[in-house]
């Protein structure tokens, strides 16, 4: 029964000290940026009913969910996604739209043990609900670019894709569900040879414009030239409209001066089936890890109430922290400036003195030791150069100068002591 008591479950880890501080700072900077842009905060439970994620299209594999039972025997899951619970809130609470919301929280997914992915991650994100025009996507992209800039993330790019275009191709070529799952992997992984074999085995006409577009899809990544190529092969108004939407977003973001942060990838297909239109993925060049994901999901909220158009983007906080650790100087947590050693009958005075120093921007802590020498040893070990002793009759300040030297003493009041 005690075999695993010293270990972490697969896909999880402990975060200590400086890394915890950095995670908190990233979350808060993201939150501040989103709130400044007019987003309102929503928080949902860490646990949800299984039924919340088990609607018809089953966007999240059942095997990836952590499941258990509540006191009534109902199936509960640790939330594997943030967008679906938000859709539940909006659909059931009948919120006024348009609505801009932001969130931050932990997401849990059971990945394969050797996949190199964490099963618990932190996501901060935004959703624009109730708007079906291109302004919603533009707002989301601008918000995320500005937030990454404020975090000083270097060399990132946000790719713009269009799952609607892919769905139009699949529908027109009458590709069945099981075949589509295989086809999707070929396109996403840009496996040109397997895609060519798929077209051959399906006996699809390579002279057909839609088949040409399908075969070219994994190669359609880059700038606006990609759009021009796709437009030439689009064989329906629906395809053309899907391509035009990507073009409008790209041009709008480029005009703002953010062109270096965006690119187009029409061969990008999100793994979550609830996306219905434009989709996004963000990467950092040096790391190659996904730091942003999202897209348009116009049919998701309808599973919980009124059908409402929506777009969202999630920022992977853990990956941002990893990038910052690699791109910047090693992060050092702020050291304690002053340690206050006190006798128990002087606790109130010690706490007042701590507050006074803190107002001056100092990081101050009360000693946990009853013996002054133990406080001195702790201070030296932790590179604290100032110790203040609150004795019964007076206050004494010690400073480390190859040894502990009395800097000042004699006052009984913390106010007059600090002013000296």
Swiss-Prot record:
SUPFAM superfamilies: Class II aaRS and biotin synthetases
Primary location group: cytoplasm
Keyword flag Cytoplasm: yes
Pathway this chain belongs to: Amino-acid biosynthesis; L-histidine biosynthesis; L-histidine from 5-phospho-alpha-D-ribose 1-diphosphate: step 1/9
A molecular-function term among this protein's GO annotations: histidine-tRNA ligase activity
Cross-referenced CDD domains: HisRS-like_core (cd00773)
One Gene Ontology CC term in the entry: cytoplasm
Keywords of the record: Amino-acid biosynthesis, Cytoplasm, Histidine biosynthesis
Keyword Flavoprotein annotated: no
Compartmental location: Cytoplasm
A Pfam family it matches: tRNA-synt_His
A Gene Ontology biological process term: histidyl-tRNA aminoacylation
Further remark: This function is generally fulfilled by the C-terminal part of HisG, which is missing in some bacteria such as this one.
HAMAP family: HisZ (MF_00125)
Subunit description: Heteromultimer composed of HisG and HisZ subunits.
Primary role: Required for the first step of histidine biosynthesis. May allow the feedback regulation of ATP phosphoribosyltransferase activity by histidine.
UniProt family annotation: Belongs to the class-II aminoacyl-tRNA synthetase family. HisZ subfamily.
Name this polypeptide is given: ATP phosphoribosyltransferase regulatory subunit
Organism, as annotated: Bacillus cereus (strain AH820)
Gene coding for it: hisZ
């Amino acid at each position: 029964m005690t075999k695993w008591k010293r270990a972490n479950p697969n896909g999880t880890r402990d975060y200590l000290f400086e890394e915890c501080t950095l995670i908190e700072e990233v979350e808060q900077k993201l939150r501040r940026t989103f709130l400044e842009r007019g987003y309102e905060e929503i928080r949902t439970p860490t646990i949800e009913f299984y039924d919340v994620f088990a609607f018809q299209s089953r966007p999240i594999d059942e095997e990836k969910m952590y499941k258990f039972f509540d006191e009534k025997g109902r199936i509960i899951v640790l939330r594997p996604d943030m967008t679906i619970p938000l859709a539940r809130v909006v659909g059931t609470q009948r919120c006024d739209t348009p609505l801009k919301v932001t969130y931050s929280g932990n997401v849990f997914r059971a990945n394969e043990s050797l996949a190199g992915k964490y099963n618990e991650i932190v996501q901060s994100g935004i959703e624009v609900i109730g708007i079906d025009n291109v302004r919603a996507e533009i707002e989301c992209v601008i918000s995320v670019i500005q937030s990454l800039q404020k975090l000083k993330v270097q060399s990132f790019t946000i790719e713009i894709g269009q799952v609607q275009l892919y769905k139009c191709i699949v529908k027109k070529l009458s590709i069945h569900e099981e075949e589509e799952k295989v086809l999707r992997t070929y396109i996403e992984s840009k496996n040109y040879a397997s895609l060519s074999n798929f077209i051959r085995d399906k006996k699809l006409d390579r002279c057909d414009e839609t088949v040409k577009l399908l075969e070219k899809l994994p190669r359609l990544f880059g700038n606006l030239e990609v759009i021009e190529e796709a437009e030439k092969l689009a064989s329906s108004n629906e395809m053309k409209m899907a391509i035009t939407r990507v073009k409008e977003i790209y041009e709008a973001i480029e005009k703002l001066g953010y062109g270096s942060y965006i690119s187009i990838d029409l061969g990008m297909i999100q793994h979550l089936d609830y996306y219905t239109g434009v989709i996004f993925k963000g990467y950092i060049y040096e790391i190659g890890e996904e730091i942003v994901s999202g897209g348009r999901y116009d049919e998701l909220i309808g599973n919980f109430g009124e059908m409402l158009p929506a777009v969202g983007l999630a920022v992977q906080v853990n990956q941002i922290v990893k990038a910052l650790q690699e791109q910047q100087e090693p992060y050092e947590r702020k050291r304690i400036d002053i340690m206050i050693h006190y006798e128990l009958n002087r606790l109130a005075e010690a706490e007042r003195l701590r507050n006074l120093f803190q107002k001056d921007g100092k990081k101050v802590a009360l000693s946990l030791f009853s013996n002054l020498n133990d406080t001195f040893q702790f201070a030296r070990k932790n590179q604290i150069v100032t110790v203040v002793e609150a004795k019964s009759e007076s206050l004494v300040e010690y400073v480390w100068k190859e040894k502990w030297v009395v800097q000042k003493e004699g006052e009984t009041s913390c106010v007059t002591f600090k002013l000296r």
